[in-house]
UniProtKB/Swiss-Prot annotation:
Gene: glpF
Protein origin, superkingdom: Bacteria
UniProt comment concerning the protein's domains: Aquaporins contain two tandem repeats each containing three membrane-spanning domains and a pore-forming loop with the signature motif Asn-Pro-Ala (NPA).
UniProt cross-references to NCBIfam families, sorted A to Z: MIP
Short sequence motif named NPA 1, residue ranges: 68-70
Cytoplasmic-side positions: 1-5, 61-63, 79-84, 170-177, 255-281
GO molecular function: glycerol channel activity
Annotated source species: Shigella flexneri
Membrane-topology descriptor: Multi-pass membrane protein
Reactions accelerated catalytically: glycerol(in) = glycerol(out)
Positions of transmembrane segments: 6-34, 40-60, 85-108, 144-169, 178-194, 232-254
Protein name per the record: Glycerol uptake facilitator protein
Motif NPA 2 in this chain: 203-205
Length: 281
């Protein structure tokens, strides 16, 4: 990370990076739902994964490319991330997701309107939830609230644990510039295998920001509830955070502690004062 990188610059990077991955991902889903594109689950998952990889390449040198509140919180708790940056990062991520969803909607506006007119869909009705799913995630109708929470928790735990593994040079061969692509591939694999259950949110900003936009764009409360008695937005908002904490904890305790180097060593060296460095010589 550049020594001249400031919190403002890092927040801008998180805003742009999160916005970029939402632009590609939501754009792909919009193409599928209202433009007649013929994407299967694997193609959609790959596009999301590549979008994340591109966003990481864009922002990693400035902010570390968290792009996800669950990742930010887990890194704060288990990888020495500065707690003073947690809230600014999360706000930037949610704002980036919101703005990207709005941008995709603006670019596809005529197609959304024509699709609703052709299929006699009243925006804001329960029948419009599927179209609202262009922007954020909703569960398979055959699973309940608790099952959806469990799915998101498990897949985010796997995501977080493997992110730490892929970015930990002490764990095997250093990945360097390949790490973003490997993380993108990881997301694609998770999406292809578990996406049909909940839409593989794994990211509170990715889901909540676009849900707020959909609410403002006319979908109203159904954007948050998903047409269910218990508001569904609570699942992708909180379950990924729990999952990321579990995944980071599991990696540190089951894998990281047995490696020759510690995740926090770099951060500790960076925070050591010149006088402390001299004293240690």
């Amino acid at each position: 990370m550049s020594q001249t990188s400031t919190l403002k610059g890092q927040c801008i990077a998180e805003f742009l990076g999160t916005g970029l991955l939402i632009f590609f991902g939501v754009g792909c889903v919009a193409a599928l739902k209202v433009a007649g594109a013929s994407f299967g689950q694997w193609e959609i998952s790959v596009i999301w994964g590549l979008g994340v990889a591109m966003a990481i390449y864009l922002t990693a040198g400035v902010s570390g490319a968290h792009l996800n509140p669950a990742v930010t919180i887990a890194l704060w708790l288990f990888a020495c991330f500065d707690k003073r940056k947690v809230i600014p990062f999360i706000v930037s991520q949610v704002a980036g997701a919101f703005c990207a969803a709005a941008l995709v909607y603006g670019l596809y506006y005529n197609l959304f309107f024509d699709f609703e007119q052709t299929h006699h869909i009243v925006r804001g009705s329960v029948e419009s939830v599927d179209l609202a799913g262009t922007f954020s995630t909703y569960p398979n109708p055959h699973i309940n609230f608790v099952q959806a929470f469990a799915v998101e928790m498990v897949i985010t735990a796997i995501l977080m644990g493997l992110i730490l593994a892929l970015t930990d040079d002490g764990n095997g061969v250093p990945r360097g510039p390949l790490a973003p692509l490997l993380i993108g591939l990881l997301i694609a694999v998770i999406g292809a295998s578990m996406g049909p259950l909940t839409g593989f949110a794994m990211n509170p900003a990715r889901d909540f920001g676009p849900k707020v936009f959909a609410w403002l764009a006319g979908w109203g409360n159904v954007a948050f509830t998903g047409g269910r008695d218990i508001p569904y937005f609570l699942v992708p908002l909180f379950s990924p955070i729990v999952g990321a904490i579990v995944g980071a904890f599991a990696y540190r305790k089951l894998i990281g502690r047995h490696l020759p180097c510690d995740i926090c060593v770099v951060e500790e060296k960076e925070t050591t004062t010149p006088s402390e460095q001299k004293a240690s010589l």
